[in-house]
UniProtKB/Swiss-Prot annotation:
GO cellular component, one term: cytosol
Annotated protein name in UniProt: Uroporphyrinogen decarboxylase
Alphabetized HAMAP family for the sequence: URO_D
Organism: Burkholderia pseudomallei (strain K96243)
Pathway: Porphyrin-containing compound metabolism; protoporphyrin-IX biosynthesis; coproporphyrinogen-III from 5-aminolevulinate: step 4/4
């Protein structure tokens, strides 16, 4: 049965086509701020239990869509699935975040790295993509909203792989980058091949857009960013399938703290660049000059403010971008676990309401 996408506003915005309103989705929209997510996680037994069981991953992916009229779903997974598939032993200790049992620190460690067999080691992710697509689609083949697949960037994955987990200063991975750039580039080369294969597998399974999260690119100095992060994002994009089932599959790249390098990110071959809240969206639109769409960029902590303040800040973001195609509203980073869900409802409503007013000429 041929499928019909009932709401393709998000995909059209990524391709800089005119839309009736500005689409919105939120990084970490399926997460701990939702009571129903916490209930499902308790049933699954752990975070990895959620991520590695397609039925649970599907359930939590759809939860925010049941609450809010969001314009896209994003696969529930984790950016560290690739290094886990490489055999580094991922674990999430309570209250401590991700940890790897076998960090990559030595020449021997690097020599053991290989691109994982995606089907054999990450089939649970592609199974989840297929199951989510089915769950988004009714009996007549009508799909509610598009599904986004994603991966961490080669550099961001390397940060966790070398540090063995999160870090305040990334001194271990940055020391390797400067002292042994040959080792760093070998890690990044394997990671880039793996990320491209992983995203292509998600596209083949049904992801209708993909996003590369370069969460720690902004930890690098200018110059080092280009060598160790941007160049490898470019390599991933060059290997991506950009069409599937006769439709364009847009790609988004997001470097947290990457506003300085906006023009360079826009020249990588992406369809859209994600922005954090430190960037003026109107000036960013002028800087990219219509070459790419922009995604962002409300400060997530604004969602702790009173509803009218949330609405005012949402209007400010929309007004900054103006009545132009090519904007997807999002936060500048992931939503906090402490965010009141009712405040998210206020945000989504205001983005839809005010962007329609802007299109009609009634907004500022």
């Amino acid at each position: 049965m041929a499928q019909t996408l009932l709401n393709d506003t998000f995909l059209r915005a990524l391709l800089r086509e005119p839309t009736d309103y500005t689409p919105i989705w939120l990084m970490r929209q399926a997460g701990r701020y939702l009571p129903e997510y916490n209930a499902t996680r308790a049933r699954a037994g752990s975070f990895l239990g959620l991520a590695k069981q397609p039925d649970y991953a599907t359930e939590v992916t759809l939860q925010p869509l049941e609450r809010f009229p969001l314009d896209a779903a994003i696969l529930f997974s984790d950016i560290l699935t690739i290094p886990d598939a490489m055999g580094l032993g991922l674990d999430f200790a309570a209250g401590e975040g991700p940890k790897f049992a076998h960090p990559v620190r030595t020449e021997a460690d690097v020599a053991k790295l290989a691109v994982p067999d995606i089907g054999a080691t990450l089939g649970y992710v592609t199974d989840a993509v297929r199951e989510i697509r089915r769950a988004l689609t009714d009996g007549e083949g009508r799909q509610r909203v598009p599904l986004i697949g994603f991966s961490g960037s080669p550099w961001t994955l390397a940060c966790y792989m070398v540090e063995g987990g999160g870090s305040d200063d990334f001194r271990t991975v940055k020391s390797m980058a400067y002292a042994r750039p040959d080792l760093m580039h070998r890690i990044l080369d394997v990671n880039a091949q793996a990320v491209a294969a992983y995203l292509n597998a998600q596209i083949e399974a049904g992801a209708q857009a993909v996003m590369i999260f370069d969460t720690w690119g902004g930890a690098l100095a200018d110059g080092a960013y280009q060598r160790f992060s941007l160049d490898y994002v470019r390599r991933v994009l060059a290997q991506l399938k950009r069409e599937h089932d006769g439709a364009r599959v847009p790609a988004i790249a997001f470097t947290k703290g990457g506003g300085l390098w906006l023009e360079e990110l826009a020249a990588t071959g992406v369809d859209a660049v994600g922005l954090d809240w430190t960037v003026n969206l109107g000036r960013a639109r002028e800087r990219v000059a219509g070459r790419v769409a922009l995604q962002g960029n409300l400060d997530p902590t604004i969602l702790f403010a009173p509803p009218e303040a949330i609405r005012a800040e949402a209007r400010a973001v929309l007004d900054s971008y103006g009545n132009h195609p090519g904007h997807v509203f999002n936060l500048g980073h992931g939503i906090s676990q402490f965010t009141p869900p009712e405040h998210v409802a206020e945000l989504v409503d205001e983005v839809h309401r005010h962007s329609r007013a802007i299109r009609s000429g009634a907004g500022s």
